């Protein structure tokens, strides 16, 4: 691996383990689905929260378990590493529709045996019209049916998925063990006054919590016995000793508190794993790993029971295990989540709650371990602040140079004040972590999905506003309509139509999300996830009922740069310079710039109009003005947990479009910026491909003009450089200074880098067998280049290569 020597290499066993996991083909796995079906059938008379608890118990007590020969940690999600379990309680629709198509996909391919197909066919009738998707769709009001039919909001990720974008309270889990949670639950249950109506529901919830804690304990004990049995027949003395130690640890954690670093790692892994067996979610993150794990690391290093080498090997094992967790999405959902990402984020760095630099020895070790494994999971985020340890920052740049898109950098200087402005307590704001792509939250205290998952496609909404409320792709009416572009006399007329249209579309997106959230609350209340999030046990309710301390949702906006460039082209070339008439532009858009005359118009739009990403106030201010309409509207709408316990319960903006720029682009005709129909939109808040001509500083200045303090859901900025650009110490220091300027002076939110050449990507597309290990940053996550669809690969290849 290029530049790998700086961080050292994996031990031989971990290198072998890594290779074994990477070589595994991802198969569809029916075991969980069969066990879940049995549990639901056996407990149809029970309240749904009890059904969910008994389902998890059934799965954890009966699923296949194994311990890999090279692993130091126990715990698996499916019958084989990288297999994707099916979660029928969410949906079976896409599974059955795509049963014979999983292996034929352009990207995100999964394999499936005939036996598995038959197992899924056998259980499918039970789940027909009896799952989250069916109930969510049944709750949708008629006025939003057109949006579901056309898929304009991209709701696949919400209809088919479980808990997402959170980190449980790992610090408390390690300190108290699940035993502490059990004792607290029993005490509160015993104190219930059943003359109070709410106590009836609390009692059921507490019973469910006790069931899942016992189930987790049983699951860990199964591994303890397995390791002991394996030790009996193991002939290698060292491995025998390791298996006996695994057995001892699994008998203890996570039920009992952890007392060593190795116990803490195993406890964290068990919880991280089981949360992704309980629920078909994603972005279930590790939180501030270097902070809550440091006391165990420090103690063991000081007493001599842990060395730097053994800690590294244990962490690299954990990250390899993290990669084994998998999820199959519908073909439609892969358009916005390409590369089978799980978004399991590990956050390091940042500040302590008393505002000091939080970097410690473990921060460096985590960085080194991620560099050694060089995988797509976990998703590593470093919290930057003005006084970040210089040596640590240097090492972050060295990891970037390895070219696998990590770490991403989030900026304390804007994120912490933004949280405080929304009502988050200062000590909690200073303890935030990344929980997915660029989204951020307070670990162990945040509601069950901080991301809305209904995309507001800005360019498509603009076209709708220009066409009196009728969508040009589907020919369906989306909004009331506020005029035709060809009849709008001034730019202000267009802006007024945009304002009303985007507000109306935002309202509809909220209706869709609320209906699905209501269905999710009633149908798939996840007990373990709730129990491990403060203060669900204290309130006696699930996370989806408002059990968390905080609960905010960020909407997702797609095509920000296309919107900016479109507005600039219209204002400058049509209304100000009058080089193009309104009718000419409209006809060219409808023609997809195909005729010779319309190709000339396209050329003018691309070459003569100001472009977002070049520090040009003309275009940058236009998009801020348009964006404010959305931000002003979205904050009006509470979520379904509002005034039910959590602080917040409201919505704010976010640009974490993941790979939805590709999928949303496929549903969007040509746009006034000169983009052709059905081509990808710009991703995140990044400029459109090759529109940024003035270098990285200009991009940073443009992005910093966005109302970042209101976009607390994340301002995702992707940048791309060739490895040669960072081949000298001088350029490395230039990049550091550039990032410091962006964060310290311009108050940028986030930045991440693809350090890979266009030539390498093109060669990988032509000769995938030569580049099996090539990892790229897609959006707020990394993926193996070869598993992406060609359209997504092309989108990444087309990004501008920056120079320093």
Write out the residue ranges for each language-model feature.
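Conserved catalytic cores of very large enzyme subunits
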Residues: 2-206, 242-245, 249-804
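A conserved hydrophobic secondary-structure block that centers on an alpha-helix together
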Residues: 230-240
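Extended non-globular scaffold/tether segments
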Residues: 207-219
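Generic hydrophobic alpha-helical segments
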Residues: 227-228, 297
């Amino acid at each position: 691996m290029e530049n790998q020597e700086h961080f050292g290499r994996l031990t031989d066993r971990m290198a072998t383990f890594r290779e074994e996991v990477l070589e595994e083909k991802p198969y569809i796995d029916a075991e969980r689905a069969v066990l879940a079906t049995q549990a639901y059938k056996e407990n149809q008379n029970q309240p749904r929260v009890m059904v969910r608890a008994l389902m998890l118990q059934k799965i954890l007590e009966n699923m296949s378990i194994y311990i890999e020969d090279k692993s130091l940690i126990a715990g698996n999600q499916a019958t084989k590493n990288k297999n994707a379990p099916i979660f029928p309680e969410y949906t079976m629709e896409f599974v059955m529709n795509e049963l014979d198509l999983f292996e034929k996909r352009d990207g995100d391919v999964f394999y499936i045996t005939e036996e598995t197909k038959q197992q899924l066919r056998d259980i499918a009738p039970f789940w027909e019209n009896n799952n989250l998707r069916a109930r969510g769709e049944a709750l949708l009001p008629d006025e939003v049916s057109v949006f579901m039919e056309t898929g304009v909001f991209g709701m696949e990720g919400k209809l088919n998925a479980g808990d997402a974008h959170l980190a449980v309270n790992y610090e408390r889990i390690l300190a108290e063990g699940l035993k502490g949670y059990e004792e607290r639950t029993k005490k509160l249950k015993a104190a219930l006054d059943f003359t109070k109506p709410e106590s009836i529901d609390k009692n059921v919830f507490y019973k469910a919590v006790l069931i899942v804690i016992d189930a987790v304990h049983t699951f860990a004990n199964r591994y303890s016995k397995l390791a002991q049995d394996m030790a009996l027949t193991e002939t290698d003395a060292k491995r025998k000793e390791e298996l006996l130690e695994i057995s001892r640890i699994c008998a203890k954690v996570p039920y009992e508190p952890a007392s060593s670093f190795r116990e803490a790692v195993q406890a964290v892994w068990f919880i991280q794993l089981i949360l992704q067996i309980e629920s078909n979610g994603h972005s279930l993150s590790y939180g501030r790993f270097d902070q809550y794990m440091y006391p165990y690391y420090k103690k063991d290093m000081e007493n001599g029971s842990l060395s730097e080498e053994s800690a590294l090997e244990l962490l690299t094992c954990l990250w390899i295990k993290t990669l084994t967790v998998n999820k199959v999405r519908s073909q439609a959902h892969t358009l916005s989540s390409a590369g089978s990402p799980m978004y399991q984020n590990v956050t390091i760095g940042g500040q302590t709650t008393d505002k000091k630099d939080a970097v410690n020895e473990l921060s460096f070790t985590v960085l080194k371990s991620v560099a050694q494994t060089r995988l797509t999971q976990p998703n590593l985020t470093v919290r930057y602040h003005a006084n970040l340890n210089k040596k640590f920052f240097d090492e972050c740049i060295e990891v970037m140079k390895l070219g696998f898109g990590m770490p991403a950098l989030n900026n304390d200087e804007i994120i912490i004040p933004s949280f405080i402005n929304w009502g988050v307590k200062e000590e909690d704001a200073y303890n935030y972590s990344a929980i997915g792509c660029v989204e951020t939250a307070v670990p162990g205290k945040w509601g069950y999905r901080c991301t809305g998952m209904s995309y507001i496609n800005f360019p498509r909404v603009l076209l709708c506003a220009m066409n009196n409320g009728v969508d040009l792709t589907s020919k369906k009416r989306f909004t009331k309509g506020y005029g035709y572009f060809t009849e709008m006399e001034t730019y202000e007329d267009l802006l007024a139509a945009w304002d009303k249209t985007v507000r109306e579309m935002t309202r509809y997106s909220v209706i869709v999300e609320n209906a699905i959230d209501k269905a999710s609350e009633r149908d798939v209340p996840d007990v373990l996830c709730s129990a491990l999030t403060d203060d669900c046990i204290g309130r006696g309710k699930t996370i989806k009922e408002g059990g968390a301390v905080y609960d905010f949702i960020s909407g997702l906006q797609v095509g920000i740069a296309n919107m900016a460039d479109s507005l600039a082209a219209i204002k400058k070339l049509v209304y100000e310079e009058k080089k193009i008439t309104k009718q000419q532009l409209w006809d060219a858009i409808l023609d997809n710039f195909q005729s010779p005359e319309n190709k000339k118009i396209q050329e003018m739009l691309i070459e003569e109009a100001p472009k977002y990403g070049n520090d040009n106030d003309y275009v940058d201010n236009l998009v801020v003005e348009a964006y404010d309409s959305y931000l002003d509207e979205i904050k009006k709408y509470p979520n379904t947990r509002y005034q039910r316990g959590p602080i917040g319960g409201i919505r704010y903006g976010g640009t974490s479009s993941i790979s939805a720029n590709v999928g949303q682009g496929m549903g969007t005709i040509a746009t006034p910026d000169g983009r052709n129909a059905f081509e990808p939109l710009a991703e995140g808040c990044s400029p459109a491909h090759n529109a940024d001509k003035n270098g990285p500083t200009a991009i940073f200045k443009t992005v910093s003009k966005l109302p970042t303090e209101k976009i607390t859901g994340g301002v995702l900025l992707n940048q791309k450089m060739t490895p040669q650009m960072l081949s000298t110490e001088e350029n490395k220091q230039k990049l550091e200074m550039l990032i410091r300027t962006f964060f310290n002076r311009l108050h940028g939110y986030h930045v991440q880098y693809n350090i890979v050449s266009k030539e390498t990507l093109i060669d990988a597309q032509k000769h995938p067998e030569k580049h099996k290990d090539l990892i790229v940053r897609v959006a707020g996550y990394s993926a193996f280049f070869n598993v992406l669809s060609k359209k997504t690969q092309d989108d990444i290849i087309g990004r501008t290569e920056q120079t320093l």
